[in-house]
Amino acid sequence: MSKLVADGYNEIKKAAGPWPEIGWYRGVIRPCHVWQGRIFISGMGREIMINILGQIEDNKLPDIETERLYLRERLVSDAKEIFAYASLAEVTWPAGFPPAESVEEEENYLENIMPKRWIEQKIPSGYGICLKGTDEVIGSIDFNNRHADDVLEMGYLLHPDYWGQGIVTEAARALLEVGFTLLNLHKIEIECYGYNKASQRIAEKLGFTLESRVRDRKDAQGKRCNLLRYGLLRSEWEGR
């Protein structure tokens, strides 16, 4: 959040008095700057709304509403929709794991494997990505690895039908907001293979810095490629 927007946000918050944890608000921060929901971000001439609906409960992150998306907890009942993209080789291999083989396998992952990983790695629950106005999960975004107490790695998947629309970037901005505010992280990282150009573009759009390029690593299929790691510090995010 830029200093200009943050100052305006604080002014409105002070004037409004005590705030409920869940709500919808609208106010003028500065000329041409309109704040909606709990958070306002202005970027590249566009208004970007991020509305965080509540707070963290145990390990569950609050639902989030953005301009076009609704991010919510993934449920076992979402298995069929998630399988629709998690079963595609062009989606999963670049992300570092093999395609799901059945809806039943996906159900087991959602019900047993995923919650166990959250506990063992001390990472918060992630999100299913839904288009606003629908409840269909078309993608996933979460913190999939913990590298330090205050450093988490972000990962994401999206059904190919929705590629090229900026959906992952929009969802990732919301996850950054949660990570740096509610989770009080110092740094968020993104790791991808050198041939995954789409993931590299997302990291660059979000303001991440390429910090390392490890040569000739094996990918999930055993093929040699570069492994790239990007990082974004909280101080850099606050200064945007």
Regions found by a protein language model. Give the residues of each.
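Short, well-ordered strand-loop elements centered on a beta-strand within folded domains, enriched
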Residues: 115-116, 154
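Hydrophobic residues in alpha-helical segments
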Residues: 86, 95, 117-119
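Conserved GNAT-fold acetyl-CoA-binding loop/helix
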Residues: 90-114, 127
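Acyl-donor (CoA/ACP) binding surface of acyl/acetyltransferases
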Residues: 3-4, 13-15, 24-25, 33-92, ...
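Short loop/turn motifs at secondary-structure junctions and domain boundaries
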Residues: 117-122, 208
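N-terminal, intrinsically disordered charge-dense segments
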Residues: 19-20
